[in-house]
Amino acid sequence: LKLYAPKLYECSVPCGNVDDQGDGINMGIAVGAAALRMHEGFAIAPIYPPENVLSGIVVNASGQRFISEESYHGVLGDAITYHQKGQAWLITDQRSGYNFHQDNFLPVAEGSSIDVIAAQLGFPLGALQQTVNYYNQHAINGDDPMFRKSKTYLRPLQGAPYKAWDLTVADAFFPAHTF
């Protein structure tokens, strides 16, 4: 995994047998087989249930949304693993967060405003606030022009405490396996 699929190797929960060291692959290569597309795999980011967290927003290290939060777990996992350098956070307000601290999604920042948690996470100055402002402006009108989140989960983020939940592949519950 480390050799052929290093991005999946970074995921916190590789699926498979710990004694599986690729012996079958190595035997095939030894007799002349070609090892093609060995980097392919499946990373899973199971952020729901509970469904109320889908009213939050998922952002990257720049404090920007990059996907609809209601995306299938595998689509979200793929986007974080392969397109966001393995880093993402779920931003929630008083109504959209988890009701308890789950081992797989630990809150890594909490505050009375979006700017407070953005500073705790080291996001570029004003970036997360701008993302939330844009999202809220459209959510109030029942629209998500960027990612078309369904109206079921679309509502403005408003009301402290605001929290950021860690979705980074190395730290969150992030199962992964190769094909």
Residue ranges and their predicted role:
Residues V31, S62, S68, L76, ...:
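A conserved active-site cap/scaffold subdomain adjacent to cofactor or substrate pockets
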Residues L1-G41, A45:
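Glycine-rich loop(s) and the adjacent beta-strand/alpha-helix scaffold that form part
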Residues I91, N99-N141:
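N-terminal leader/propeptide and maturation segments of large enzyme subunits in energy/redox metabolism
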